[in-house]
Protein backbone atom coordinates (compact mmCIF):
# COMPACT_ATOMS: atom_id res chain seq x y z
CA UNK A 1 0.00 0.00 0.00
CA UNK A 2 1.42 3.38 -0.99
CA UNK A 3 1.65 5.97 1.71
CA UNK A 4 2.32 9.66 1.47
CA UNK A 5 5.59 10.76 3.04
CA UNK A 6 5.10 13.90 5.11
CA UNK A 7 8.19 15.56 6.52
CA UNK A 8 8.14 18.37 9.03
CA UNK A 9 11.05 20.09 10.73
CA UNK A 10 12.74 16.95 12.05
CA UNK A 11 16.24 15.57 11.45
CA UNK A 12 16.43 13.59 8.20
CA UNK A 13 20.15 12.93 7.73
CA UNK A 14 19.89 10.18 5.13
CA UNK A 15 16.88 11.40 3.16
CA UNK A 16 18.68 13.48 0.54
CA UNK A 17 21.71 11.25 -0.11
CA UNK A 18 19.64 8.06 -0.09
CA UNK A 19 17.13 9.29 -2.66
CA UNK A 20 19.88 10.88 -4.72
CA UNK A 21 21.64 7.51 -4.83
CA UNK A 22 18.46 5.77 -5.91
CA UNK A 23 18.09 8.34 -8.68
CA UNK A 24 21.57 7.60 -9.97
CA UNK A 25 21.18 3.82 -9.66
CA UNK A 26 17.94 3.95 -11.62
CA UNK A 27 19.67 5.92 -14.37
CA UNK A 28 16.82 8.43 -14.52
CA UNK A 29 17.10 11.85 -16.08
CA UNK A 30 14.71 14.73 -16.71
CA UNK A 31 12.31 13.89 -19.50
CA UNK A 32 11.34 16.30 -22.23
CA UNK A 33 8.06 15.46 -23.89
CA UNK A 34 7.43 16.58 -27.44
CA UNK A 35 5.64 19.91 -27.62
CA UNK A 36 1.92 19.43 -28.32
CA UNK A 37 0.29 21.52 -31.06
CA UNK A 38 -1.08 24.89 -29.98
CA UNK A 39 -3.35 27.47 -31.54
CA UNK A 40 -4.18 31.12 -30.78
CA UNK A 41 -6.76 31.93 -28.13
CA UNK A 42 -7.34 34.70 -25.59
CA UNK A 43 -7.60 35.27 -21.89
CA UNK A 44 -11.16 35.12 -20.58
CA UNK A 45 -13.22 38.27 -20.17
CA UNK A 46 -12.94 37.88 -16.38
CA UNK A 47 -9.15 37.58 -16.60
CA UNK A 48 -8.93 40.66 -18.78
CA UNK A 49 -11.17 42.58 -16.38
CA UNK A 50 -9.04 41.45 -13.43
CA UNK A 51 -5.73 42.67 -14.86
CA UNK A 52 -3.55 44.79 -12.58
CA UNK A 53 -0.47 46.27 -14.29
CA UNK A 54 2.71 45.97 -12.23
CA UNK A 55 4.34 49.12 -13.48
CA UNK A 56 2.85 52.62 -13.95
CA UNK A 57 2.84 54.69 -17.12
CA UNK A 58 3.56 52.64 -20.23
CA UNK A 59 3.65 49.41 -18.19
CA UNK A 60 7.29 48.65 -19.00
CA UNK A 61 9.62 47.65 -16.18
CA UNK A 62 12.39 50.14 -15.30
CA UNK A 63 15.05 50.19 -18.00
CA UNK A 64 13.20 47.72 -20.22
CA UNK A 65 12.10 48.18 -23.82
CA UNK A 66 9.21 46.98 -25.95
CA UNK A 67 9.66 43.56 -27.56
CA UNK A 68 9.20 43.14 -31.30
CA UNK A 69 6.99 40.08 -30.71
CA UNK A 70 3.62 40.96 -29.13
CA UNK A 71 2.25 38.96 -26.24
CA UNK A 72 0.29 35.91 -27.34
CA UNK A 73 -1.99 33.37 -25.67
CA UNK A 74 -2.09 29.82 -27.03
CA UNK A 75 -4.28 26.78 -26.29
CA UNK A 76 -2.97 23.20 -26.18
CA UNK A 77 -6.08 21.26 -25.12
CA UNK A 78 -8.79 20.10 -27.56
CA UNK A 79 -11.18 19.70 -24.61
CA UNK A 80 -13.04 22.96 -23.78
CA UNK A 81 -13.77 21.58 -20.31
CA UNK A 82 -10.04 21.21 -19.58
CA UNK A 83 -8.28 24.24 -21.05
CA UNK A 84 -4.49 24.26 -21.09
CA UNK A 85 -3.49 27.73 -22.22
CA UNK A 86 -0.15 29.44 -21.95
CA UNK A 87 1.15 32.92 -22.58
CA UNK A 88 4.56 34.12 -23.72
CA UNK A 89 6.26 37.34 -24.86
CA UNK A 90 4.93 39.21 -21.83
CA UNK A 91 6.24 42.73 -22.29
CA UNK A 92 4.16 44.59 -19.72
CA UNK A 93 3.81 42.23 -16.74
CA UNK A 94 0.60 42.14 -14.74
CA UNK A 95 -1.45 40.32 -12.14
CA UNK A 96 -4.85 38.69 -12.54
CA UNK A 97 -6.79 38.86 -9.28
CA UNK A 98 -9.22 36.15 -8.17
CA UNK A 99 -11.29 37.37 -5.21
CA UNK A 100 -13.38 35.19 -2.89
CA UNK A 101 -16.91 36.06 -1.85
CA UNK A 102 -15.81 35.71 1.78
CA UNK A 103 -12.11 36.59 2.06
CA UNK A 104 -10.23 35.30 5.09
CA UNK A 105 -7.50 37.95 4.83
CA UNK A 106 -4.83 35.68 3.34
CA UNK A 107 -3.43 36.28 -0.14
CA UNK A 108 -1.19 34.32 -2.46
CA UNK A 109 0.99 35.63 -5.24
CA UNK A 110 0.66 32.66 -7.61
CA UNK A 111 3.55 32.03 -10.01
CA UNK A 112 2.73 29.34 -12.60
CA UNK A 113 5.44 27.32 -14.31
CA UNK A 114 6.36 26.72 -17.91
CA UNK A 115 10.10 26.08 -17.87
CA UNK A 116 10.82 29.82 -18.14
CA UNK A 117 9.78 29.48 -21.80
CA UNK A 118 6.07 30.17 -21.24
CA UNK A 119 3.59 30.76 -18.41
CA UNK A 120 0.78 28.24 -18.07
CA UNK A 121 -2.58 29.80 -17.29
CA UNK A 122 -4.94 27.01 -16.28
CA UNK A 123 -3.59 23.96 -14.42
CA UNK A 124 -1.45 26.21 -12.17
CA UNK A 125 -3.69 29.26 -12.37
CA UNK A 126 -7.43 29.21 -13.02
CA UNK A 127 -7.75 25.59 -11.79
CA UNK A 128 -6.76 26.76 -8.30
CA UNK A 129 -9.87 28.91 -7.90
CA UNK A 130 -12.38 26.30 -6.61
CA UNK A 131 -10.09 25.00 -3.84
CA UNK A 132 -8.24 28.12 -2.79
CA UNK A 133 -10.65 30.97 -3.57
CA UNK A 134 -14.18 29.59 -3.42
CA UNK A 135 -13.61 27.07 -0.62
CA UNK A 136 -10.52 28.45 1.10
CA UNK A 137 -11.33 32.17 1.05
CA UNK A 138 -7.82 33.07 -0.15
CA UNK A 139 -7.36 35.97 -2.57
CA UNK A 140 -5.17 34.91 -5.49
CA UNK A 141 -2.99 37.20 -7.57
CA UNK A 142 -1.75 35.20 -10.57
CA UNK A 143 1.41 36.64 -12.11
CA UNK A 144 2.07 37.03 -15.83
CA UNK A 145 5.80 37.66 -15.65
CA UNK A 146 8.49 38.47 -18.17
CA UNK A 147 10.46 35.49 -19.43
CA UNK A 148 14.26 35.61 -19.18
CA UNK A 149 15.15 34.40 -22.67
CA UNK A 150 13.07 36.87 -24.67
CA UNK A 151 15.48 39.80 -24.77
CA UNK A 152 14.52 41.93 -21.78
CA UNK A 153 17.06 44.44 -20.55
CA UNK A 154 17.39 42.78 -17.14
CA UNK A 155 17.76 39.27 -18.61
CA UNK A 156 17.78 36.53 -15.97
CA UNK A 157 16.60 38.98 -13.31
CA UNK A 158 13.48 40.07 -15.23
CA UNK A 159 11.20 37.44 -13.61
CA UNK A 160 12.49 38.24 -10.10
CA UNK A 161 12.04 41.97 -10.63
CA UNK A 162 8.42 41.29 -11.58
CA UNK A 163 7.87 39.01 -8.56
CA UNK A 164 9.33 41.59 -6.18
CA UNK A 165 7.15 44.32 -7.67
CA UNK A 166 4.05 42.10 -7.53
CA UNK A 167 4.51 41.31 -3.83
CA UNK A 168 5.08 44.98 -3.06
CA UNK A 169 2.02 46.01 -5.06
CA UNK A 170 -0.23 43.52 -3.27
CA UNK A 171 1.05 44.69 0.12
CA UNK A 172 0.76 48.38 -0.76
CA UNK A 173 -2.86 47.99 -1.86
CA UNK A 174 -3.86 45.24 0.59
CA UNK A 175 -6.76 47.18 2.11
CA UNK A 176 -8.30 47.63 -1.33
CA UNK A 177 -8.64 43.85 -1.69
CA UNK A 178 -9.47 42.93 1.91
CA UNK A 179 -6.03 41.41 2.45
CA UNK A 180 -4.02 41.39 5.67
CA UNK A 181 -0.64 42.92 4.70
CA UNK A 182 1.03 40.46 7.09
CA UNK A 183 -0.58 37.37 5.50
CA UNK A 184 0.71 37.61 1.95
CA UNK A 185 2.44 34.48 0.69
CA UNK A 186 3.82 33.26 -2.60
CA UNK A 187 2.98 29.94 -4.27
CA UNK A 188 5.03 28.75 -7.24
CA UNK A 189 4.90 25.69 -9.47
CA UNK A 190 7.82 24.08 -11.32
CA UNK A 191 9.89 26.93 -12.83
CA UNK A 192 7.45 29.24 -11.08
CA UNK A 193 8.54 27.47 -7.90
CA UNK A 194 12.11 28.48 -8.70
CA UNK A 195 10.95 32.07 -9.08
CA UNK A 196 8.95 31.88 -5.83
CA UNK A 197 11.96 30.42 -3.98
CA UNK A 198 14.14 33.14 -5.50
CA UNK A 199 11.72 35.76 -4.20
CA UNK A 200 11.77 34.10 -0.77
CA UNK A 201 15.57 34.20 -0.63
CA UNK A 202 16.37 37.35 -2.63
CA UNK A 203 13.42 39.59 -1.76
CA UNK A 204 15.73 42.37 -0.54
CA UNK A 205 18.10 42.35 -3.51
CA UNK A 206 18.02 45.69 -5.35
CA UNK A 207 17.48 45.04 -9.06
CA UNK A 208 16.73 48.61 -10.17
CA UNK A 209 16.40 52.09 -8.74
CA UNK A 210 13.01 52.69 -7.04
CA UNK A 211 10.49 54.15 -9.46
CA UNK A 212 7.82 55.08 -6.91
CA UNK A 213 6.69 54.57 -3.30
CA UNK A 214 5.57 51.01 -4.02
CA UNK A 215 9.17 50.05 -4.81
CA UNK A 216 10.05 50.92 -1.19
CA UNK A 217 7.46 48.53 0.30
CA UNK A 218 8.97 45.31 1.72
CA UNK A 219 8.95 42.46 -0.83
CA UNK A 220 9.42 39.61 1.66
CA UNK A 221 6.61 37.03 1.45
CA UNK A 222 5.17 36.09 4.83
CA UNK A 223 5.25 32.42 3.77
CA UNK A 224 5.93 30.40 0.64
CA UNK A 225 4.48 27.28 -0.96
CA UNK A 226 6.59 25.49 -3.56
CA UNK A 227 4.93 22.78 -5.64
CA UNK A 228 7.27 20.45 -7.57
CA UNK A 229 9.74 23.36 -7.71
CA UNK A 230 12.84 23.75 -9.80
CA UNK A 231 15.53 24.67 -7.26
CA UNK A 232 19.04 23.58 -8.15
CA UNK A 233 20.92 24.94 -11.17
CA UNK A 234 24.21 23.15 -10.49
CA UNK A 235 23.87 19.36 -10.33
CA UNK A 236 22.22 16.18 -11.55
CA UNK A 237 18.78 17.28 -10.36
CA UNK A 238 18.81 20.42 -12.52
CA UNK A 239 15.93 20.90 -14.95
CA UNK A 240 18.00 21.58 -18.06
CA UNK A 241 15.28 23.45 -19.93
CA UNK A 242 14.68 25.97 -17.14
CA UNK A 243 18.41 26.55 -16.72
CA UNK A 244 18.93 27.07 -20.44
CA UNK A 245 16.12 29.62 -20.63
CA UNK A 246 17.33 31.41 -17.50
CA UNK A 247 21.11 31.31 -17.91
CA UNK A 248 21.85 30.31 -21.50
CA UNK A 249 23.62 27.34 -23.03
CA UNK A 250 26.87 27.23 -21.05
CA UNK A 251 26.50 29.24 -17.83
CA UNK A 252 29.49 29.82 -15.58
CA UNK A 253 29.64 27.94 -12.29
CA UNK A 254 29.23 31.13 -10.27
CA UNK A 255 26.08 32.02 -12.22
CA UNK A 256 24.57 28.60 -11.55
CA UNK A 257 25.31 29.04 -7.84
CA UNK A 258 23.82 32.54 -7.87
CA UNK A 259 20.52 31.28 -9.29
CA UNK A 260 20.22 28.20 -7.04
CA UNK A 261 17.89 29.29 -4.20
CA UNK A 262 19.17 26.68 -1.74
CA UNK A 263 22.45 28.62 -1.70
CA UNK A 264 20.74 31.75 -0.36
CA UNK A 265 18.58 30.44 2.48
CA UNK A 266 18.98 32.34 5.77
CA UNK A 267 17.13 32.43 9.07
CA UNK A 268 15.00 35.22 7.55
CA UNK A 269 13.71 33.03 4.70
CA UNK A 270 9.91 32.70 5.03
CA UNK A 271 8.29 29.56 6.47
CA UNK A 272 7.97 27.07 3.63
CA UNK A 273 5.54 24.37 2.46
CA UNK A 274 6.92 21.89 -0.10
CA UNK A 275 5.00 19.46 -2.32
CA UNK A 276 6.55 16.96 -4.75
CA UNK A 277 5.88 13.57 -6.32
CA UNK A 278 8.62 11.00 -5.88
CA UNK A 279 8.11 9.72 -9.44
CA UNK A 280 8.71 13.15 -11.02
CA UNK A 281 11.10 12.51 -13.92
CA UNK A 282 11.06 16.09 -15.21
CA UNK A 283 11.98 18.02 -12.07
CA UNK A 284 13.43 15.40 -9.71
CA UNK A 285 12.29 15.33 -6.10
CA UNK A 286 15.90 16.09 -5.09
CA UNK A 287 15.09 19.74 -5.81
CA UNK A 288 12.64 19.86 -2.91
CA UNK A 289 14.95 17.76 -0.75
CA UNK A 290 17.85 20.16 -1.31
CA UNK A 291 15.71 23.13 -0.35
CA UNK A 292 14.31 21.29 2.67
CA UNK A 293 17.85 20.56 3.86
CA UNK A 294 18.91 24.20 3.46
CA UNK A 295 15.83 25.41 5.34
CA UNK A 296 16.43 22.93 8.17
CA UNK A 297 20.07 23.99 8.46
CA UNK A 298 19.01 27.65 8.74
CA UNK A 299 16.29 26.95 11.30
CA UNK A 300 13.43 27.99 9.00
CA UNK A 301 10.05 26.34 9.73
CA UNK A 302 9.31 23.89 6.92
CA UNK A 303 6.68 21.28 6.10
CA UNK A 304 7.19 18.89 3.20
CA UNK A 305 4.81 16.40 1.58
CA UNK A 306 6.26 13.81 -0.80
CA UNK A 307 3.72 11.70 -2.66
CA UNK A 308 4.58 8.34 -4.26
CA UNK A 309 2.86 9.11 -7.57
CA UNK A 310 1.87 12.15 -9.55
CA UNK A 311 4.71 12.78 -11.97
CA UNK A 312 5.31 16.39 -12.88
CA UNK A 313 2.83 19.21 -13.35
CA UNK A 314 -0.14 17.56 -11.64
CA UNK A 315 -1.52 20.81 -10.20
CA UNK A 316 -4.97 20.03 -8.83
CA UNK A 317 -6.83 18.39 -11.68
CA UNK A 318 -4.03 15.87 -12.33
CA UNK A 319 -4.39 14.25 -8.91
CA UNK A 320 -7.64 12.29 -9.37
CA UNK A 321 -7.31 8.92 -7.67
CA UNK A 322 -3.94 9.78 -6.13
CA UNK A 323 -2.95 10.58 -2.56
CA UNK A 324 -1.48 13.79 -4.01
CA UNK A 325 -5.08 15.04 -4.23
CA UNK A 326 -4.73 15.96 -0.55
CA UNK A 327 -2.19 18.71 -1.13
CA UNK A 328 -4.60 21.70 -1.50
CA UNK A 329 -6.33 20.80 1.78
CA UNK A 330 -2.97 20.41 3.51
CA UNK A 331 -1.78 23.71 2.03
CA UNK A 332 -4.85 25.61 3.23
CA UNK A 333 -4.46 24.20 6.75
CA UNK A 334 -0.80 25.21 6.73
CA UNK A 335 -1.61 28.73 5.48
CA UNK A 336 -4.13 29.10 8.29
CA UNK A 337 -1.50 27.99 10.81
CA UNK A 338 0.81 30.79 9.67
CA UNK A 339 -1.38 33.26 11.56
CA UNK A 340 0.67 32.30 14.61
CA UNK A 341 4.07 32.58 12.91
CA UNK A 342 5.80 35.90 13.46
CA UNK A 343 7.38 37.56 10.41
Question: Where is each model-derived feature located?
Answer:
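C-terminal catalytic histidine-bearing segment of alpha/beta-hydrolase fold enzymes
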Residues: 275, 285-343
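Catalytic nucleophile-loop/oxyanion-hole region of alpha/beta-hydrolase
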Residues: 120-122, 127-128, 141-181, 318-325
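Active-site glycine-rich loops that stabilize anionic/oxyanionic intermediates
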Residues: 112-117, 278
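Short beta-strand element of the alpha/beta-hydrolase
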Residues: 105-113
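Short beta-strand/loop motif that positions the catalytic acidic residue
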Residues: 274-276, 280
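Primarily recognizes the serine-hydrolase "nucleophile elbow" in alpha/beta-hydrolase
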Residues: 165-238, 256
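N-terminal cap/lid segment of alpha/beta-hydrolase-fold proteins
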Residues: 37-102
Amino acid sequence: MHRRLAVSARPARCLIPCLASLWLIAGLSPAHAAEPPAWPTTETAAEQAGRIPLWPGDGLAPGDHALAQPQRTLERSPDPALPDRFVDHVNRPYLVVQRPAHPNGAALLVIPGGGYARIVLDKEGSALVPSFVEQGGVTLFVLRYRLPGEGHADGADAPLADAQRALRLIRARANEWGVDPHRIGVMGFSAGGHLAASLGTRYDQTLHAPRDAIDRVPARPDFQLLVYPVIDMTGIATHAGSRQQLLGDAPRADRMQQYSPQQHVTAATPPTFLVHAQDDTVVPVENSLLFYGALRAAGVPVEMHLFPRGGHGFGIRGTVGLTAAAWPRLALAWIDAQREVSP
